């Protein structure tokens, strides 16, 4: 099937922002203007097109990234609407991994907010070119220039206005386009009719000044253009647009526009900017892939290269079952074809191919390079897997890295009969979300769920009830502590039983070393066949199993390097099980030799409070072992306090903050890092945990 849109006409973009900045409403307006929907749904009414899960419509927040395809002025725009709540940053992360450009939505009153910083950092990691849309210009306290300035000061990013507002707050009427040097006034109707007017007299000097700033800012990205500017030559419209595009594609220059999506002002101009300045798949560096152990290869964005795609999201659809979202980096993909999962080394069949619009869909026969599609029928593919043409040279795209869960809860179904349904439901939810884990506590037999925050787990439990018909009782949230080692030691592990009948013989020497931030690393240095090859994997597995249950207080162990360097075997009595047990015994024995310590999750907390309550809240954070990182007074008179605080001290904080600030304070929290627990606190936790484990025995 012939390609319907040239690759240079594609725009794969994400809409990202802090919670409540108006992302979903903005996406709704884009869909309205591009002809995708005919009736507007409002987030605050629970009727938004992109927020299609029941929980999203009830809570008025976006949880999963809904994908949709729209068309504007001959361009094909694939849009991902991402959540702004910190418990769902995995959705932002995996979207940015497969997008080419993004629109960052700011609230005109607040400018850059805590979660804006998080998503901006994520986008910077993937070098995603961005356009800034300052929304809610009609809101009390709205200030376009202060919002743009906050991008420069808070994000250290070169944001430059390409529009200025005509009026603000309730007087916001339209915009002056600094590229065209024309003014537009909006009628506020859903069609967003714009009337060209004279640039208001009181804005003419400011418009000239800001246009000159824009020209000088983009001139630094092109020497020839800069020489013209220095010679006083006025750029043509096409020249200036080309220069803004060139600067934006560097991911170092960020054009800023403004509007109010809810009041239908400025969105069409923002879509024009998406088309004019954000990249096509041909404008960004080719995707990198690994071939074999050490070779890195480029995957060119073309239909002529063998099919290469990344599975960036898996979700369960009530009508078609499992849907796997794929970004095609190269080649073509047909429904009914076989592909190779090079991450897992398995073959998969593409049953059907679907173009998604929030939760409605249309089937297609073929997808091309640059497309974002959903495939039905994949059995073993999970988030982050590379899919390639069946007989193509084997390559693997760079994997996505997801944070470890920091909070857990015990879960049990209200009836024993529902155990099987519960296990199946949890398995499906874990396949969709890489930051959600579920396992059975071997000591208690309880089902444990673990995730990125209380809201994350609330929604998991809610989805179990709605989608899988399982009502469950939930225990109190628990901190997910970790254990690690701080010293190196050579440790012997033996499992030898040789009295009568077939015996058991496993004998290892393992060097344990700290491995900060690198997870578990196993190195085989056995030479001369001292331990036969077939027992090496069981030794590694024995260590991994023991690490999962810990050696200090029953918490999982992280960041350890284990080097197997010596040992012995018995011709008759050695077995996989014996070596597994020997390795486990070595790690248990190492407890006092390697300086085993307890680690606690430290959270990045941003608290927004009126000035009157600053002292009380600051004192409370200090009492919670919080370390203040930054304090800033915003334009609206509120303070933002950023601090690093142990998760164990933050349970119930929402209620405490409400009571301290008469309901006027709010906060956001996300995992930052694991840190050694202070000895007095660690001793108390270990003591309680060991009593608990003893009682359960």
Swiss-Prot record:
Q: Which residues form the tr-type G domain?
A: 8-282
Q: Which GO terms describe its cellular component?
A: cytoplasm
Q: State the InterPro entries in the record.
A: EF-G-like_DII (IPR053905), EFG_II (IPR041095), EFG_III (IPR009022), EFG_III/V (IPR035647), EFG_IV (IPR047872), EFG_V (IPR035649), EFG_V-like (IPR000640), G_TR_CS (IPR031157)
Compartments reported by the entry = Cytoplasm
This protein's UniProt keywords:
Cytoplasm, Elongation factor, GTP-binding, Nucleotide-binding, Protein biosynthesis
Q: Pfam families from the xrefs?
A: EF-G_D2, EFG_C, EFG_III, EFG_IV, GTP_EFTU
Q: Which PANTHER family match?
A: RIBOSOME-RELEASING FACTOR 2, MITOCHONDRIAL, TRANSLATION ELONGATION FACTOR G-RELATED
* Similarity field: Belongs to the TRAFAC class translation factor GTPase superfamily. Classic translation factor GTPase family. EF-G/EF-2 subfamily.
Q: What is this protein called?
A: Elongation factor G
Task: Identify the coding gene.
Answer: fusA
